[in-house]
Amino acid sequence: MKKVLLFVILLLLSLISFSQMGLSQLAVNVPRNETIIANILSGRIGSPDNFNVWPATWRSPDRGIQQLMLEPLWIVDPATGKVINALAKDKPIYNSDFTKMIVKIREGCYWSDGVEFTADDVVYTVELIMKYKEMGYNASFNEYVKRVYKTDKYTVVFELKKPNARFHTYFLDRWGACRPLPKHVFEKVKDPIAFDFKPPISSGPYVLNSYDPGGYWVLWERREDWQRTPTGKLFGMPQPKYVLFYYYGPTEKQVLAQNNHQLDMADLTMEGLRSVLQTNKYARAYRKEFPYIVNVDPCVSGVIFNNAKAPWNNKEIRWALTLAIDIVDYVGLAYDYAVTVSPLHIPATPAYMEWYFKPLEPWLKNLTITVDGKPFKVYDPDVPMRIAENARKRGYNVPTDPNEIRKIFGIGWYKYAPDIAEKLLIKNGFKRDKDGKWLTPDGKPWKITILTPPNPASVNYRNAFALSQVWKKFGIETEVYATENDGTLMNVGDFEVSTSGQWPAREPWGGHPDLYRTMEQFNSSYYRPLGEYYPGHQCRWTNPQMDKVIAEMQKISWDSPKNKTLGMEGLKILAQEMPTIPTFTYPGVIGYDEYYWTNYPTAENPYCIPYHHWPNFKYMLPFLKPTGRK
């Protein structure tokens, strides 16, 4: 209730400054009914005059550069579970030992200035990046590329210094990739690092129209020759003639903008989403009903133990603290039950449900740990039913069909077993004082500091808050340490427990069953002592069985049927060892205003990942439908 009241107050304060704002103040001479307006997720643009995103410098790619201006060779879509061939017309072709990769270029694609996109652009992009250490992907390309060349206008050959069955993933867009640059522009530039690429030319379906020098907005206009882009060839004409990316600021200002029909796609908090759904009859969420959230995000949130420090290097302690979590209370505290729980170290998206969760559920039901010399089954398949029941008690409309409940809230999680957790802790020298508070083996009060970033609306912070409460209930003193330095502290191992960093496991590709991207971060070759920068997963956990899984994955194509088997083996090892705790899939909270446009991606029609900040946004635009309102 306090959160709602605070949100209303902030909303009213924002209204004072926003009430006079119209579209004419956002961009000049733009017909509103031909324009879709989306929020800039990453905030105000720090370098609005610079459109050169190839140097390893943050240049706000989500202002439309990655969504509209540039096409990749390939792009992955977590909603459909597919990899889309974009500027490449087919999958990469490898030789038997993965030391050569051939790329076939899609014919008939053109840069917006009329120059054809060819193999020359790809070859030049890679060679230029290898020449300048300030360029993104410089280290990776210099590590792997022996030679890159074309054999004809539409064929590129990469000869590699050493085998890499996933070399193509450097060009696979999933909120970041090496996207080809225009050779005919950059070859005339003396300094490609200092070059601002202004005005930019596009390989994608939109070109720059105008932008705010202050960094608040960028306006893009559909290319007249949109059909000569991968977007046009694959999906047809993008329906909006104009796309305006605008940074509105915090949620309350985005809510006001949507209520005034000046923002079609917003990045909201749950409080903001509830507000706009109540005040704008044209507003909707990804789901029509509770829990409203996006369930196709390829990230899983949760808890990270520092396995290089005691007692977190003890598997029994990690399991004790896992079983001390009542996940139903936890998700109620974190997101008012609006989540999909995940017992595995990958997101519980529909695609991964089919690839991994459902096949592994029988194994999860029989997963045991040893307590007092006896096996104890740790998995609880009834968790989603309990979440649904608690959500109903809060007044939410929740289905009663068990299958629907599992689709929404997940297949299950781990048991809340404080008695078992207590036995494991006592076995390892911990004990309770007369007030029931836990003491360490040396008799001192046990206090756990939980590291997290400072934004209370972030999923990381909400995990930390919920974790703090459930462990306190179990008798452990906790402190949430919220700091902007969380990333630095994690990189050098200066933490105990965290909900920040690289998630409980690095997110997978999202639209492909290959889990190498997730497992590879646990490779023991990355290990560094505390105090040194850690290039692998920040939990600093290593395991010889996981090393074997990773080594086998490196030997096979990511499309190999064996890959899924290896992925399952890796997930089993992570579940058994619990070096980190997965809690729930990242709950994306977006708001659509359907006053001017409809047919957004939704839970009923998940034809594309629904995020306007993802590079897939350009593939959403051909499917939008104008309402005809002026």
Q: Model regions: which residues?
A:
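N-terminal lobe/hinge region of extracytoplasmic solute-binding protein
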Residues: 22, 37-96, 127, 201
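Detector for C-terminal structural segments
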Residues: 21-36, 40-47, 64-65, 212-221, ...
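Surface-exposed binding/hinge segments that line
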Residues: 20, 29, 104, 139-187, ...
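Aromatic- and charge-enriched surface segment that lines or borders ligand/interaction sites
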Residues: 90-135, 151, 157-159, 257, ...
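Gly/Pro-rich hinge or "lid" segments in bacterial periplasmic/extracellular proteins
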Residues: 58-60, 64, 70, 75-79, ...
